[in-house]
Amino acid sequence: FQPGCNCLIGKDFRRWHGACDGSVVGSDKESGMARTFYDEMYDASGNCRPHYREFARWLAETPEELLAQRRREADLLFHRAGITFTLYGDEQGTERLIPFDTIPRAIPMSEWRVVERGCIQRVKALNLFLADLYHEQRIIKAGIIPAEQVLANEGYQIAMQGLDLHRDIYAHIAGVDLVRDGDGTYYVLEDNLRTPSGVSYMLEDRKMMMRLFPELFAAQRVAPIDHYPNLLLETLKSSSPLDNPSVVVLTPGRFNSAYFEHAFLAREMGVELVEGADLFVRDDRVFMRTTSGPQPVDVIYRRLDDAFLDPLAFNPESMLGVPGLLAAYRSGNVVLANAIGTGVADDKSVYPYVGDMIRFYLDEEPILRNVPTWQCRKPEELSHVLAHLPELVVKETQGSGGYGMLVGPAATAAEIEAFRERLKARPDAYIAQPTLCLSTCPTFVEKGIAPRHIDLRPFVLSGRETRLVPGGLTRVALREGSLVVNSSQGGGTKDTWIVED
């Protein structure tokens, strides 16, 4: 251990993690959340957790130079494969390689089963909420969610009112962001129901680990995830009432931040990747332009925001969408996955009500907890937030990617005061939460191995049934002390292992 660098050199990381795991960093009596860091690999006594023992043994026996060589090889292979994302506003170039860490995040199967059941329960309730919101609005009439909270929401689409969808599914693909608090409890940080991204990195990270370290997978049973594209295609086909519907992936184009993923998923599913200009609508039917003439399209896996889907119905300046698409959709001649208007359910101002949705629609208690949340639109909660800004994380209700937020403990006094004025000017645009003690996982950094904060995004598919592959995208905040894991903010990824207990 080198003083001052907060990292480890060589194999001495076990002793360091044992000493640091569970160190108290404060308390939060109001939220009831633990204020310690949970280390995924080591317990508070410094002992390796059982599901990591095989990996820890391998890591201790593997020469450091070989590990470094494999990490360099991973970077080279990711570059060659074009596994990048686009960083908007970057003056030095738009395409970036997402840093990949070769120490996996491992989860025992018994623990995963709870996460799986909780994600399925949550997405089922969210789909029921969307079906209810765009029809009878029973949850509003019951006084559980205020009407203005959803009907005046930017994500609510009046064009969806009264429209019946096959199987009543709105969010066919959902990403549920999970974090683990200091006592090991999983919390849902947010739901992603519009165009959730990141699954391609989950799949490519696994391919990379199997290529670089096949001996690890021979020594330990890790649940497979490579069947995800097949499950996704089954889900998309089941969203249509037709026996064998034609499916396409609609992308905004190669300058979109997730274009690699759009192309990757289309290729893996064996379907066409199209842009808006490749499609047209005739007699309320969608067709794809091909060299063999127009071909009908039945299901569109759209990776395009609502506002850009149809210039005749939404943003008239959109050059990315398909004129007449909404009319075809409302006529029942094409399926959009995800449905238009799903954004109202993953809005951060609606997030506090998801537990109530589970109780209302499923008559069950939530398996996964929400993070305690203050709604700044409520005067009494705004007063609390303004009085405790240095301690809280404040987010825009429509924000994403780690932008437009304040992390109080990491902000300067000037930044806090500037944010205070923004908050007072538009309180309804913000929510606040306690600063989470995200769990840590050993991670390769420049000078060795050090703990870095992580989250987890499992991907939930809703078709004939609701299901997940055993895994997800683990994102890691690579900067020391950072709690922001988003790739747009310098975060990286890890392979996620679901292992036998």
Task: Give, region by region, the residue ranges found by the protein language model.
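Preference for protein termini
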Residues: 5, 12, 18-21, 25-501
